[in-house]
């Protein structure tokens, strides 16, 4: 798979501090068994890399931080 960069993710979430929070939260969800939202067949990517791939693909955004705080 192509290498993911922080710049790819910053196009979706321009604030790097919010990007860090979203990536960490989503990586924790993936590590706890959540289904990946991007195609991963046979990929050995760690949850943090998967989270960044999902953000760069536009599948995950700031909305994950607002869930449960309604």
From Swiss-Prot:
GO terms for molecular function: DNA binding; DNA-directed RNA polymerase activity. Transmembrane segments: none annotated. Its EC number is 2.7.7.6. Keywords: DNA-directed RNA polymerase, Nucleotidyltransferase, Transcription, Transferase. SMART domains: RNA_pol_Rpb6 (SM01409). It catalyses: RNA(n) + a ribonucleoside 5'-triphosphate = RNA(n+1) + diphosphate. The keyword Membrane does not apply. NCBIfam families: rpoZ (TIGR00690). The RNAP catalytic core consists of 2 alpha, 1 beta, 1 beta' and 1 omega subunit. When a sigma factor is associated with the core the holoenzyme is formed, which can initiate transcription. Promotes RNA polymerase assembly. Latches the N- and C-terminal regions of the beta' subunit thereby facilitating its interaction with the beta and alpha subunits. This is DNA-directed RNA polymerase subunit omega. It comes from Methylobacillus flagellatus (strain ATCC 51484 / DSM 6875 / VKM B-1610 / KT).
